[in-house]
From Swiss-Prot:
Molecular-function GO term, any one: structural molecule activity
PTM field: Highly phosphorylated.
Protein function: Minor protein of the capsid that localizes along the inner surface of the virion, within the central cavities beneath the L1 pentamers. Plays a role in capsid stabilization through interaction with the major capsid protein L1. Once the virion enters the host cell, L2 escorts the genomic DNA into the nucleus by promoting escape from the endosomal compartments and traffic through the host Golgi network.
GO CC, any one term: host cell Golgi apparatus
Main localization of the protein described in the UniProt heading: virion
Short sequence motif named Nuclear localization signal, residue ranges: 1-12, 442-450
Sequence similarity: Belongs to the papillomaviridae L2 protein family.
Name the UniProt record assigns to this protein: Minor capsid protein L2
Disulfide bond among keywords: yes
Cysteine pairings via disulfide bonds: C21-C27
GO biological process: microtubule-dependent intracellular transport of viral material towards nucleus; symbiont entry into host cell; viral penetration into host nucleus
Pfam hit, one: Late_protein_L2
């Protein structure tokens, strides 16, 4: 027995369900958004329309009506038909043209002729004219007189010019026949413009020179006494000449004590001076004054720690050695003049004006001893004798007289060189190779002097 299939009943549409279930609140979840146009597609169009305008295309979820203007049928426009026939000309208004002046310009134009002094032409009258004649008794004789020519020369002095006249007038000379003149030249008044002061000086007296005085910049100070440096005083004098002896053993090849010194220690070692332990670098020396002392300073770098990259980490130490104190003098020494106060003349032939001595006689000078005795040449007050030491060799003598003749030593035997023992003939050297003398193998190099200041030390 065949079973009859149950008839399927059509489900109500969303609009019908919305009308019955909206009030009771039993609508399926997809009915209300579809009827109220609140689906995801509607929300996309709603929020996208804020930034995009499609005009009147009518894009939406409603019926496809083509928007407010409807659809335009897609058909080609018909071509306009061209009919053959006579073409009528448009009416043209013809304006009358009047004749104008000719455009031809004559190249030859008559000039106006003015006859000054000619008799005026009187037009004839209709009634005719009358001719009047008279006899002339005065003969036509011209008065011929002798013509005299006058020449005038004018010379200007370029040296002299009147100061008050800016543009002098040309000279004017006149006589009975010639007159030379020129228009008057007037000078314009000079406009005075006050000068503006651009440089403002604070001093009342004003600047004394146009070139400013350059300021003296302070000299940079080396930070030898900062907190980052450890101060160590050295008492060994070898620190001045060979500081490497205080750190490592003496190296005879080393030269130059005024440069930076570097040391490399491969193993643990003891320095000759404990103050220079683990020193890997000594910077250049510097000489300065500190509290009345002349101080010789060097900056040292310790290598207490070594990293794998080869970098050394350590403290910086300031080594200094006081050379000598700068003390003031304990007492002041008065300077005395080297020349005596009296103006004495040490002349062995000076005349004496003392009483009891004949002025025509010369003073007696005893030269048997090694001293000469002289009397000063004074008039007002006698002074004591001045003894001048004079040493005379045994082979020299003095000759009396107004002049002193210096003795001459006898000439000795002329020197004659000894004949050399080497052969005097020509010397020939034959050979293909030569050797340099051992003294020239190592030529001493000139050491470059470097100023004593820290060029590689941070201040």
């Amino acid at each position: 027995m065949a079973h009859s299939r149950a008839r399927r009943r059509k489900r109500a549409s969303a609009t019908q369900l919305y009308q019955t279930c909206k009030l009771t609140g039993t609508c399926p979840p997809d009915v209300i958004p579809k009827v109220e146009h609140n689906t995801i597609a509607d929300q996309i169009l709603k929020w996208g329309s804020l930034g995009v305008f499609f005009g009147g295309l009518g894009i939406g979820t409603g019926s496809g009506t083509g928007g407010r203007t409807g659809y335009v049928p897609l058909q080609t426009s018909a071509k306009p038909s061209i009919t053959s026939g006579p073409m009528a000309r448009p009416p043209v208004v013809v304006e009358p043209v009047a004749p104008s002046d000719p455009s031809i310009v004559s190249l030859i134009e008559e000039s106006a002729i003015i006859n000054a002094g000619a008799p005026e032409i009187v037009p004839p009258a209709h009634g005719g004219f009358t001719i009047t004649s008279s006899e002339t008794t005065t003969p036509a004789i011209l008065d011929v007189s002798v013509t005299s020519h006058t020449t005038t020369s004018i010379f200007r002095n370029p040296v002299f010019t009147e100061p008050s006249v800016t543009q002098p007038q040309p000279p004017v000379e006149a006589n009975g026949h010639i007159l030379i003149s020129a228009p008057t030249v007037t000078s314009h008044p000079i406009e005075e413009i006050p000068l503006d002061t651009f440089v403002v000086s604070s001093s009342d007296s004003g600047p004394t020179s146009s070139t400013p005085v350059p300021g003296t910049a302070p000299r940079p100070r080396v930070g030898l006494y900062s907190r980052a440096l450890h101060q160590v005083q050295v008492t060994d004098p070898a620190f001045l000449s060979t500081p490497q002896r205080l750190i490592t053993y003496d190296n005879p090849v080393y030269e130059g004590e005024d440069v930076s010194v570097q040391f490399s220690h491969d193993s643990i070692h003891n320095a000759p001076d404990e103050a220079f332990m683990d020193i890997i670098r000594l910077h250049r020396p510097a000489i300065a004054s500190r509290r009345g002392l002349v101080r010789y300073s060097r900056i040292g770098q310790r290598g207490s720690m070594h990293t794998r990259s080869g970098k050394h980490i350590g403290a910086r130490i300031h080594y200094f050695y006081d050379i000598s104190p700068i003390a003031q003098a304990a007492e002041e020494i008065e300077m005395h003049p080297l020349v005596a106060a009296q103006d004495d003349t040490f002349d062995i032939y000076a005349e004496s004006f003392e009483p009891g001595i004949n002025p025509t006689q010369h003073p007696v000078t005893n030269i048997s001893d090694t001293y000469l005795t002289s009397t000063p040449n004074t008039v007002t007050q006698p002074w004591g004798n001045t003894t001048v030491p004079l040493s005379l060799p045994n082979d020299l003598f003095l000759q009396s007289g107004p002049d002193i003749t210096f003795p001459t030593a006898p000439m000795g035997t002329p020197f004659s060189p000894v004949t050399p023992a080497l052969p005097t003939g020509p010397v020939f050297i034959t050979g293909s190779g030569f050797y340099l003398h051992p003294a020239w193998y190592f030529a001493r190099k000139r050491r470059k002097r470097i100023p004593l200041f820290f060029s590689d030390v941070a201040a």
